[in-house]
């Protein structure tokens, strides 16, 4: 970190779900920063769950001085949760935000006396540091902006380039950044691409995101991955087998298909949708070039875990992939029809014509059909 930029955020391991739905077994970091200059700026606040630690860090960073500005890059409660705390402590502080954010403050019960609404390219001098504001609408809320400080070559990136996980967890950035991106930001690929073009014109030495570690040496790889992810193109050539099984028969077929594909030197990932993290499954569906869905028929449609998974992909704008379908049925096959009808509504999905219907248990003729499908998948 630059000497003039002080970290005042905090991590927690006391939260089981982020946004009430995403498993965070390794905790979560809520980042906030102080830029120390003639005029002090605080870059965002934090979730209420880490208020005490944030206040402790803030007091230490300020060392008795009063901040002039609070830069509000994103109003989601995990970042705006302590704006009112700050306003009570420093009633004359000026909130710096976009016009859209200013219009939204009231719905978060935030009543600030001094508000500075900024536009694309506006600058704010703190003394030896100058903040330049970069609008980033729909990355991933409409009021979002980023902030660039030229003397330190620092980009404060709001939710972009963030990841799941507390800062005391040592893991490769991409491991949880990928799951974070496709589930939190992924739907908004075009806005992300637009802000990447803006970032590409900047000389960036350090990225300060609102979640996850501060980035420096990793920046070229981070930008490379974000360019791929935001284009909705696959990161890896390979097959993700997503299956759901009621009594174990479809699971057996899925394991057999994995074996067949790997014998043909394909890169394969596999997941039981009934027993795994749906956010991880969404990540893998976007990561690989081909998705193989295998599920039983159920109530005249497709088994519920598969229906939920496909619905989630649809909401995240899943596209530009090859998709293969396998169904299981004892008396009325309906899964392929149901799955196909959903994928046909998605953009640039290449549905493989060859589908497989298994009648309850896996038999030799079914294995032959799976081998034929594997050949189609790997064409």
Language model: regions and residue ranges:
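Short acidic active-site motifs
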Residues: 82, 276-281
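Metallo-beta-lactamase
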Residues: 1-3, 96-144, 188-194
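Active-site metal-binding motif and surrounding structural segment of the metallo-beta-lactamase
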Residues: 38, 49-96
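Active-site neighborhood of phospho(di)ester-bond hydrolases with catalytic His/Asp-centered motifs
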Residues: 43-45, 67-75, 95-98, 155-159, ...
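Short, charged N-terminal beta->alpha structural module
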Residues: 242-264
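Conserved beta-strand hairpin/beta-sheet module of binuclear metal-dependent hydrolase folds
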Residues: 3-59, 146-149, 153-157, 250
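Short N-terminal or domain-adjacent regulatory/targeting segments
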Residues: 208-235
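FMN-binding flavodoxin-like domain, especially the glycine-rich phosphate-binding loop
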Residues: 167-207, 211-214, 256-271, 281-379
């Amino acid at each position: 970190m630059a000497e003039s930029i002080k970290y005042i955020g905090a991590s927690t391991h006391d939260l089981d779900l982020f946004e009430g739905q995403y498993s965070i077994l390794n905790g979560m970091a809520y980042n906030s920063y102080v830029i120390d200059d003639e005029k002090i700026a605080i870059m965002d606040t934090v979730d209420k769950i880490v208020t005490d630690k944030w206040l402790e860090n803030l007091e230490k960073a300020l060392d008795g001085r009063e901040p002039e500005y609070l830069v509000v890059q994103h109003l989601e409660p995990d970042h705006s949760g302590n704006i009112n705390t700050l306003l009570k402590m420093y009633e004359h502080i000026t909130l710096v935000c976009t016009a859209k954010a200013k219009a939204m403050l009231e719905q978060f019960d935030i009543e600030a006396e001094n508000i500075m609404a900024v536009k694309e390219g506006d600058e704010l001098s703190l003394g030896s540091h100058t903040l330049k504001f970069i609008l980033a609408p729909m990355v991933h809320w409409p009021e979002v902006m980023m902030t660039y400080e030229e003397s330190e070559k620092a980009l404060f990136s709001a939710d972009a380039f963030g990841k799941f996980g507390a800062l005391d967890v040592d893991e490769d950035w991409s491991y949880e950044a990928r799951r974070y991106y496709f589930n939190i930001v992924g739907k908004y690929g075009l806005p992300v691409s637009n802000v990447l073009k803006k970032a590409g014109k900047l000389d960036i030495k350090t990225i300060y995101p609102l979640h996850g570690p501060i980035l420096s040496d990793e920046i070229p790889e981070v930008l490379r991955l974000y360019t791929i992810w935001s284009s909705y193109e696959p990161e890896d050539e390979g097959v993700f087998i997503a299956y759901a099984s009621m009594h174990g028969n479809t699971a057996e077929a899925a394991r057999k298909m994995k074996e067949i594909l790997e014998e043909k030197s394909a890169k394969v990932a596999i997941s039981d949708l009934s027993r795994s993290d749906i956010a991880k499954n969404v990540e893998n569906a976007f990561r690989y070039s081909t998705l193989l869905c295998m599920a039983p028929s159920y109530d005249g449609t497709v088994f519920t875990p598969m229906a939920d998974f496909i619905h989630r992909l649809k909401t995240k704008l899943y596209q530009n992939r090859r998709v293969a379908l396998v169904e299981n049925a004892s008396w009325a096959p309906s899964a392929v029809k149901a799955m196909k009808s959903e994928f046909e509504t998605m953009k640039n999905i290449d549905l493989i014509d060859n589908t497989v219907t298994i009648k309850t248990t896996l038999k030799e003729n079914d294995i032959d059909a799976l081998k034929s499908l594997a050949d189609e998948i790997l064409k």
